Amino acid sequence: MIITKYQALALSSVALLVTGCSPSSDTPSVSNISDYQGSASITQGLATTVESNLFECANGRSRVAGVGEITDSEGKVWTVPAKNNFSTGPKAFDLYEECSNTTPSSLAEVDQSSVPVAIVDQDGEEITGYIFADNYFELYINGKLIAVDTVPFTPFNSNIVKFKVKKPYTIAVKVIDWEENLGLGSEDNRGKAYHAGDGGFIASFSDGTVTGPDWQAQTFYTSPIYDLTCLSEVDGKRLSESCTTEGTDHGQDAYAAHWETPNNWMNQEFDSMSWPQASVYSEDDIGVNNKKAYMNFIEKFSGAGASFIWSTNVVLDNEVLLRYEVK
């Protein structure tokens, strides 16, 4: 007979009782998939790697940025950490990027005249944007893909973009907190093999637009989850605030919650009224005080009035879509 992974979990628990052994105190207690009552599709365990690494750092070290696929109980295949345009999209101009030896100590050392200008409206205003993402971003203006991050995972970097557009216009951003353990939302970090990373996105634009609580942010992939009853949904928010963020050496059976991204989410006419407002995080929350890609140009980030934003859980939410209308 065929034993499912859920039956295997139950049998292993019985075996522990029979032999008198007990699981390690570091082993998280994994709930049953039937405990989940929300709108997400649930997967469990490690994904199958379909792309081993999207990026090699030419100068220094970088975390492996793989892409995987995992199938839920209904047979739907999910891409983790998210579908992306890193390999094919237009790359943003490097503000600070160690792998390309672009390491200016201040904005005065940056040749901003070399930044290419993406055209949304030929007769529009030319706007410059300064972006720092932990880890990865894809920027759309009125549905047009303007630029993608030049580093999917690490080392931390920052970028400049330029585009011509007429007001009003819509900024839409896909942000991804990358993962080493594909499908499990975690990485080998802080002495644990399965430790959840954190995200964060901040940007300012030359027309005065800055990231803040008036932006919208919706979650589309949350992991690692060990107790599915910790997930909830209230007023459009996909919440995981009651879920543990502690690292472990035994996280291979963690769950993940997935929501389908709308095909036209980046378009100006997309209706995002049901999406919650973005959550704001401090520089200490994101941990950028030792990141030169941020600190060397802080006048264009928090110094310009911008705030770090994400969804309601900057640790467990790994794929987030952001939107903002500039009037």
Tell where the protein language model's regions lie, with residue ranges:
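A general, composition-driven signal for non-globular sequence regions
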Residues: 1, 145, 162-163
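Bacterial N-terminal signal peptides that target proteins for export
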Residues: 1-10
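Hydrophobic helical h-region of N-terminal Sec-dependent signal peptides
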Residues: 11-15
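C-terminal motif of bacterial Sec signal peptides marking the signal peptidase cleavage site
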Residues: 18-20
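Bacterial signal peptide processing site
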Residues: 22-24
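Beta-strand-rich recognition domains
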Residues: 27-137, 156-327
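Short, surface-exposed beta-strand/strand-loop-strand elements in extracellular ectodomains
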Residues: 136-146
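Short beta-strand segments within Ig-like beta-sandwich modules, predominantly Fibronectin type-III
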Residues: 147-154
